[in-house]
Amino acid sequence: MKGRYAIYFTPDPRGALWRAGSSWLGRDAVTGAAVEPNLPPALGRPQWRELTEAPRRYGFHATLKPPFRLAHGFEPVDLVSACEDFARSRAAFFAPPLRVADVDGFIALTLHEPSAAIDALARDCVSVFDRFRAPPSAAETTRRQAATLTRRQGALLLRWGYPYVMEEFRFHLTLTERMNQPGRAALLNSLAATFDRLTRAPVRVDGIALFFQPSARAPFAALRRFPFGSHDDRAKRRSERRVVSVLSQFDKKDLAKLSSR
């Protein structure tokens, strides 16, 4: 199937953090529904739409395995099975609380302090699922190399298809596009107040989520969430129906392969 897949961390879709993040971005990546944002008084709707355009398309998430096209010889069902196996072998854990921060000109939710467990999870996702990643096109590699990368980031780009992985990884849930400094400081303070009550407790990391983007400008959709340590066959079947429902919008041939599992 054409399009790109990605493996993300997402908060519990039933929880307040997911609702707040989806509301700010204006879209729920699980349901696909538009969500009415509660904007700060000083922020107009046109400016908000511009500031959140790319984050809204990607959905509220933290990247674990950056977006990739499926390698030749693999089908979506193979990736789903690998996600099941990966999640089944892991246990839930807590990461430090979040905070709203300036990340290289973007506003994002980041951890209050480093987490070895989060870093290990991201590292494992990058390496374990790399066999499913098709090599980037020459144009994609050239575009990435045009950015200001360190020598190490350039080496990571060539090895893993993305420069900000392994020791260059930084856990974050993006809230805005890159912004100019004057407006960024004011909006950061507003968003810190918006998310304040939701960023006081440790973050429960209890699964991974598989997302799919059918075309370059289309939004990423959550195909399925894989709880850590889960052996619940009924939940598995419900989740598989979710995968089938989303993919059925794009390619009936791949739908048949998934639904025959």
Cite the ranges covered by each PLM segment.
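Conserved, mostly hydrophobic/aromatic
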Residues: I208
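Basic, often amphipathic N-terminal segments
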Residues: M1-V103, A116, A120-P202, S215-F250, ...
